[in-house]
């Protein structure tokens, strides 16, 4: 597969011919320009209100080692946007930092008998040097690390504000547990029943854990996606919508009859189909829910206990699988259907989840496949209450769930489903046994982690006072410096629990003995607000400067991988909405526009050590230069598509860059020369390139901009060479070379800066300003008409855009190439599509 994108004029090839390119030295440029940029503070925003502001942000990296090919692609994309907006005259904030808390650092510390900070900050230094070499146009004065106490002080401060609003709370619940890492996982961190990070099968464990009440914001998180539509990828919005999972239906109250010494109990279920209540033939509670133990009779208790042990070993994916045979245990109890008074046997089963809905369901096997599978396994009744025109589910084994009219449903008989649902809800509400309700798949965010290298939770547990937040003036609660190596090994409880001098403190309220909370926060908490801190990272009176925050927020362009669609992006939206509700910011969405870059593959597969198909970024940079690697990443495909490194050619990019750089060497006219006196054809190409590039950049079609740039370089070289090399004196050549330098600076900043310098301009080309174009020069004097004989191209004619069909036909027939192809044959027909095509069919 070629890396050369199709343009309007065909495939743009990387130019390799031309003058001697040996004097082009990427190593010399990479050594020269970074210090100049730093001294001039080229990438530091003025931030004085004199220019319109734009905020461009790449998802900040985790310091797991040096930069890799994925970083090279993602950060090149964001850098193009930032550099383009600067050229357009905006004051651009493009900061950089590190998401530096996390489990890999802790595991590295255990392996090396060190403190996690040593590994973390050594890697940060390595990555920072690589980012600078890679010419990322970041404002380094705003650099931050989430593991710095001056950062996580404000993470803790925000946690307290959430706590005060009832949005941070603790509860006992079954949680996802990774046996290898000995820590809990949020639902979003479990993939196909396994730990997202290490791949170990996840089990369930009951723990007292901290949660953020993200469900309070479910409606807004869903509804506000409308304002992101058209600016975020549709697949990201679809993934978030499905994860939030809003379902409209009803809460229905069932009475569980008393049995033996077990009293009667009211249990509420959520259903999207209250119209099918007459079809309920049994009742199911989640086997792992406390309710199951509460309901079971003594006769069935032992069977339930054994079954619950089996369920503990199953992942959520396995429990909800449609392929597994259904299992369950009868509890010995019966639920009363509120509409018809029928008694339904109550079962405990694994296919119902304790933390979804209410942890209990009314089972309607005729119209739900999982219920039907369960009913067939345990020989329970199946009663159809919706006539869809299909065969009886009790016979076919296939539940029906389409449109239809109600049957076997008392007063609901004969109603279509759309009318039966609100009618059933009205009946329930009138008799006080149910109500309309909206349910969400989204569950509250589990944020506790039993690990060391994270933000400590700023809560003190006092025997007398209960939970006591650490006073603001005592923040940050810092991590103890003396824990390292084996002290951090997974033990099922947080390593912080072993730091007795750290744990045992005085209660801020009663001054009695108390203990710190020993869990740390999920690292996604740190990354849910970092974009706000970048606005004023040195501010000491709050998480950000209230006088500055609304000048920059929301982020205008956010760049990162689609793998963060549910986790980071959803959490960041939640945090932003809460902080907005606290009255701290005007924006209630963090990112106005989102660009998801594709993956970098090798041989059609993701790069990995196990496959042995990794490509070392450092080696590529050393061999071809930063600019060639950046340009290859951009040119290889549209930003959102994958790049297969096996199919691309950094060497071709390097040759093109040398050819572009040579243009500046060959310009002999003085700066400021009147381009209007130069070659009009070249000027037309230059101005069309400027106009087209701007339009393409505005729509993130970066690869096509590079193709247009290649065409301009070729046209400029052609003009220079047309006068036996003396064409460099043509002021139109200078104009073209300067345009090349400015546009190229977005993709290949070292080469462009060197060109700008050779052309007689002071540094930096990054602030040169986007070149203007003359509309009159966008009108082409000629267009290329393709002449085909029997479907094969035989000639190309430069003609007026206004040429008529008759004139174009005559020119085509008069062509020597066409006459040679006809070889004396007559003509059956001539098809003319002026001004671009003539197709001649011989007799």
Swiss-Prot record:
Residues that, per the record, bind ATP: 609
Keywords noted in UniProt: Aminoacyl-tRNA synthetase, ATP-binding, Cytoplasm, Ligase, Nucleotide-binding, Protein biosynthesis
Broad EC category: ligase
Highest taxon above the source species: Bacteria
The protein's Enzyme Commission number: 6.1.1.4
Known catalytic reactions: tRNA(Leu) + L-leucine + ATP = L-leucyl-tRNA(Leu) + AMP + diphosphate
Example GO molecular function: aminoacyl-tRNA deacylase activity
Single GO BP term: leucyl-tRNA aminoacylation
NCBIfam families (UniProt xref): leuS_bact
Name of the protein this chain belongs to: Leucine--tRNA ligase
Organism annotation: Arthrobacter sp. (strain FB24)
UniProt lineage: Bacteria, Bacillati, Actinomycetota, Actinomycetes, Micrococcales
